[in-house]
Amino acid sequence: ICGDPLATSLSHPLAEAVTGQPGALVNPALVLHVSIGQSTVATRQVIANLFYRGVALHRPVRHGETLRSTVTIQGLRELSRREDRPARGLALLGIHTTCVNPNGSDGPTVADYERCAMLRFRDPEATTGHNDDLGAADPEVDLEAWHGLAPTWDAAPLRPPRPVDPPSGQRRTDPLRDTVTNAPELARLTQNLAGVHRDRALGPGGRRLVYGGHTIGLAQASLCRMLPDTGTVLGWQSCDHPAPVFEEDVLTFHHTVLDERPSGSGRLRAVRVEVDAERSDGSTDAVLDWRLVTWGA
């Protein structure tokens, strides 16, 4: 659905040459789609997901492995009431995803992160008094803090014939825009239970809301087109959704390499990806501001 050309997930021989292990790697975006989908057991009545932060991918996932996620409520905040909308509040969730061992027990950690969901009240007349400080994501990426997640793989097979070395701080726009399609299909495939992604009656203006990870998946696909020497994604420093995305929106992707550091035979990159959506009426909105860390050649 997202068309991600990440080479280590598309090619068995290349994945084996890079990792030194047999078998193909599951795309890290798909790993997080599944994890996020599992976490929606806590947010079926979501209005929107506002942000992700501190996303850390601790190990790669290979085909055939089973994932399990646990969700912890880390904070709740009731929002101010307005006559033109139902009662709502914010829930800060901590998600921990593991691989399942053959005996059914939790195995090694795959991912840890937080996400903030805006939810409808079960009882619109209720007053909860919740007013937790949910904090804010730090957008500044310190690559030194990410070295512990970097793999000890061989980056040489990822190096293209012509080096890919975009100058740090230069904003580059992907010439290939992309149209958002198959949104409910991705939600179903990843067991995302949020009704707003499946039922247009629950969305703003009677339109289905595109799952935020769908936009992120298309943004990662664009990143891998622009930086084809990318081997994997190690995590997301921050990820904000400033406006909703709808099916048939046409997305434009802007990429800025913020920093890079050597790591083993490869390098770490801190990248900012900004996405704009062109609507059916011709208007344009910023819909994603994403700061992530990659490892590659």
Language-model-derived ranges and their functions:
Residues A56, C116-M118, D174-T179, D240, ...:
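Generic structural detector for well-ordered beta-strands
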Residues H63-T152, E247, H254-A297:
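HotDog/MaoC-like acyl-thioester-processing domains
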Residues Y52-L57, W236-P242:
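Short alpha-helix capping/helix-loop boundary micro-motifs
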